[in-house]
Amino acid sequence: MTRSPCSTTSRWISSMSTSEYRAVDAESDLPISAAELAALASQLYAASIRPGPDSPPQQAPVAPRGSVPDATAATSAGRTAAGTADVYPGPVPQVGGRDVYLPPPASPAPEAPPQAAPPAPRGSAPDATAATSAGRAAAGTSDVYSSWVPQLGVADIYLGAPTPAGPEAPPQSAPPAPRGQVPDTTAAATAYGADLSAFAVPTGIVSTAPGVQAGTAPPVPVVPRAATAPSWLPEAPSVADLGWSDAPAPDAPAGDEHDYHFLTKTDPVPQFRDEHEVFDVAAIRSDFPILKETVNGKPLIWFDNAATTQKPQVVIDRLSHFYAHENSNIHRAAHELAARATDAYEEARDTVAEFIGAPSSDNIVFVRGTTEAINLVAHAWGAKHLQPGDEIVITHLEHHANIVPWQLISQKTGAILKVAPIDDAGNLLLSEFEGLLGPRTKLVAASHVSNALGTVMPVDKIVELGHRYGARVLIDGAQSIQHIPIDVAELGADFFVFSGHKIYGPTGIGALYGTEEALTETPPWQGGGHMIADVTLERSLYQGPPTKFEAGTGNIADAVGLTEALRYVQRLGVERIAAYEHALLEYATPRLADIPGVRLIGTAQEKASVLSFVLAGHEPLEVGKALNAEGIAVRAGHHCAQPALRRLGLEATVRPSFAFYNTFEEIDVFLRAVRRIAEGGANVG
């Protein structure tokens, strides 16, 4: 992955001699010499670190601050008693402000002298058991780490038991447990990997056509359809497909070919195996602290994922670590914290580019979210390239964020906004869409997934048709980025936009992907610091993409948090997430449709996550309040998609929407609550 060019200041920092800086932080007060320190680190490394089969030989990490305690109790009894999610398998040394993971050493042979315990984390801790159990239990949080070291486990990293040095060696202690109790591995594999019926896709799903006909669109067939997986899902999803054993590829270490800015670099640790041997929803849920909340005395059931997703602990920890250890402005200072923050921010850009398949990090512009990204294209690209009589084509399914900006720029430029229709099931009428395209079409903008109905749009065909008529094409990925594997190079769109908070990241951060050609022909839309190359009182010269679109101080911390969210999703696997969420949707759809008075809204063949409905005799807001009384969070309203709902003769719907941390049991609770409301047994109003 190529990295965006760095500022002169940051390059100067990178070129400074390492001899000008101590090998460890200034706070360190080690009672041994540097040579002894290196020897100790080498000994510990040789005794304890077990690289993966593809890992290159690693340089020994530097020992941490403080004395070396007895770590046996810390790694086994301490963490087990705490019941919290340590994100490393052993004590964490801190080297030059960077954390290094050091696993516990292998057991010695029967007659060998005891091995030295691993070094203690962050200062001296004479009683490691008390430090681990009492300290972390009181804090209720896991230790944080720097962005240089990849965190591979979603809860704790499971390590296989080390091979004993001799036949008489004592048994090994169990690997660290995640948040909560870990069942026996064999039982877990049987419970989650062998019983496929729990994840079976129901059959006989009935498409419920709305009772309102609009326009000349053909009606939805009322015959039942087969429950078939969308084309973007893996074939024949099952529990076996939801598990995996291959470890994720390790991050490439920073070399001379990259523009990393850290003054003190550490070698990456060996790659550990991810602990989730199967798609264990219970273990995944333990990574999301908010799911332990109660609402009105009931366990929280978060079915409002189309509005925003909840955040895993690793994202929360990463944000905290940034503000505790890296907080600074970026690209424009000659000190250590600026170097750390700059590197973390640019690493976030690299991560986004990799996640969506962009050819370069220079294709990624950080914005506040999808709405700002679309406005950037409309008011920067559109203001330059749209003339009176030119045409913009959108669809009837769009979120207001993909309607209003085009209305505004059309009013300013005299362009014409055209809208492609949908049928009563919520499908785009592709032939009608193509009929709107012509020689004056300059831009096509369409959602990948409808936020109101869940319809998966044929974006590959939309891009192909748009380009056939010479138009630029923008795809709104706000509702697809978290559910569907994205490859922008394969898709071929000129622009692709999404929000971080929709994919388990922080709010206030999102990304605009643009091809090199599209970004080059787009002028800056805001002026200020950072985006300039040179300024005089008479004129200004601008940087190239993506810098010219990022005036002022960006949302640095939340970009760094987005990095961790995307890595979390990558560890689980987007294809596995898609298969599991589709199973949830196919399970809920026929059971909800079977409740008297329920009418499903949006019954397209290919859907993702969203299950909109109305209930006869009840306003959607009443249903939403009644469900909230049961601890169930859904959206009730027009979902910022009034044209789509009005096309179907409605002003509002109830919209549950699913994510990979939701369960079939939660769906059952939801269905029972809706049935009670329908039968008059719930307090509505």
Curated annotation (Swiss-Prot):
Enzyme Commission code: 2.8.1.7
* Disulfide cysteine pairs (residue numbers): none
Active site residues of this protein: 640
User: One GO molecular function term?
Assistant: pyridoxal phosphate binding
Q: Which SUPFAM superfamilies match?
A: PLP-dependent transferases (SSF53383)
Please give one Pfam family short name.
Aminotran_5
Please note every region of biased composition (Low complexity). Answer: 71-85, 122-135
Name a biological process GO annotation.
cysteine metabolic process
Spans annotated as Disordered: 48-135, 162-185
Q: Which residues carry this modification: N6-(pyridoxal phosphate)lysine?
A: 502
Renumbered to this chain, region (Cargo-loading domain) spans: 1-282
Question: Biased-composition ranges for Pro residues?
Answer: 102-121, 164-178
Main location group: other
* Other facts noted in the record for this chain: Cattle naturally infected with M.paratuberculosis have antisera that recognize this protein.
What does the subunit comment say? Isolated from bacteria in a complex with encapsulin 2A (AC I3NID5), strongly suggesting it is found in a type 2A encapsulin nanocompartment. There are 1-2 copies of this protein in each encapsulin shell.
Q: Which family does it belong to?
A: Belongs to the class-V pyridoxal-phosphate-dependent aminotransferase family. Csd subfamily.
Name used for this protein in its record: Probable cysteine desulfurase
What species does this protein belong to? Mycolicibacterium paratuberculosis (strain ATCC BAA-968 / K-10) (Mycobacterium paratuberculosis)
Q: What is the lineage of its organism?
A: Bacteria, Bacillati, Actinomycetota, Actinomycetes, Mycobacteriales
